Amino acid sequence: MTFRHCVAVDLGASSGRVMLARYDSKHRTLTLREIHRFVNCLQKTDGFDTWDIDSLEKDIRLGLKKVCNEGILIDSIGIDTWGVDYVLLDKQGQRVGLPVSYRDNRTTGIMPQALVQIGKSEIYRRSGIQFLPFNTIYQLRALTKQQPELTAQVAHALLMPDYFSYRLTGEMNWEYTNATTTQLVNINTDDWDDTLLAWTGAKKSWFGRPSHPGNVIGDWICPQGNRIPVVAVASHDTASAVIASPLANKHSAYLSSGTWSLMGFESKMPYTTDEALAANITNEGGAEGRYRVLKNIMGLWLLQRVLKERRITDLPALIAQTEALPACRFLINPNDDRFINPDDMRAEIQAACRETDQPVPVSDAELARCIFDSLALLYADILHELANLRGEKFTQLHIVGGGCQNSLLNQLCADACGIRVMAGPVEASTLGNIGIQLMTLDELNNVDDFRQVVSANYDLTTYIPNPDSEIARHVAQFQPKRQTKELCA
């Protein structure tokens, strides 16, 4: 068979897509086509910020049916989503309540309890995962303490991509890359950690052993009656994005830029030293036994909220106005937990500037300038931190995901980091999803083989650092004095 058709379901925190990939194995060409796009947003349910999971499932099925109705024979399906959130099921496999979003405030004050009762170094020694107040470990603790009546009904807990795979196939699976984001997987055994899980109050029987990417979970029966394999891809969207990052060598770092920015490097070994703990470095699971050694950055969430609040629809025009403004007049720490989900992002940014005796951004362009400059400076700090951790400098940074379309931010990043930036591909999560499917179908050998396909089929844009730019001069003057505040650590 010369052609393969694979479908990637890629769910983000603000939107979802069903994408069709066509791979020509003879010429090693890979094309993507968007079949269906839909909105994903939070809703208030009984006082909690929850996901409209039934609407998401409806749109996933609609997208799959659209492909089938075109007469295309699908070879496989894969699903990737964000991490940490989960869906509860009873003994009959029916949903118990609605999944609560990681942005809900129910976990407030929970993480400090764990640090006292288990110990920060002990949690890190076991999991190797960064401390974020919304990690699944703290969500489950909040669930069992705050909603015992719900807990009593639970027989299974599935992470988001595993839930949708279950709904398509009837088979349960706990995919490894997403499971590691929970802070509940033991970094030495790749299985759930008994001590950490016991602290949450959740039962170990709710979970099956995590499985690495590349296994077939089960089949979805399409409207025409064909049985289509559903593959457990690297179901954490960042894990998929990293798979599609055309990293040239060990001196390349990556930045997955979207609602969240995740900056890191690939490693065959985890970094769980005291230095890594102090820097709140995470060691999330990747494909082929690789670790994604990285740090979370609040990312373009701040901009997305400002755009929504200000009802801005012309982003290119805003970026053009922003580019005309001087750099580094308004600076915030994007990783301050005050920006996780404020009632008014614009007001929160202004308050942060006011509290640090800076000018206050008023116009939309000034707010955007504040966000872009602040992100670029944080990128520079974290890249320096990662280089120190591994004892080697990076020579290149690959920016992938939707945020890599922002040419202003890309150049600011290159200037602040003092490093060459390669931007693209945009559809990194979708491509990485497809890559694992093609490996499972025996069309590709491994991740490195797939990256060669990505490099050959997708154009990258190069940004050369300008040492004379305003932000580069700012870094040269102030970076030795700057300290990176950890996101909610």
Swiss-Prot record:
It catalyses: L-rhamnulose + ATP = L-rhamnulose 1-phosphate + ADP + H(+). Pathway: Carbohydrate degradation; L-rhamnose degradation; glycerone phosphate from L-rhamnose: step 2/3. The keyword Kinase applies. ATP binds at A13, S14, S15, G16, R17, T259, Q304, G402. It comes from the Bacteria. It holds the Pfam family FGGY_N. The keyword Amino-acid biosynthesis does not apply. InterPro entries: ATPase_NBD, FGGY_C, FGGY_N, Rhamnulokinase. One of its GO terms (cellular component) is cytosol. Involved in the catabolism of L-rhamnose (6-deoxy-L-mannose). Catalyzes the transfer of the gamma-phosphate group from ATP to the 1-hydroxyl group of L-rhamnulose to yield L-rhamnulose 1-phosphate. This is Rhamnulokinase. It comes from Salmonella enteritidis PT4 (strain P125109).
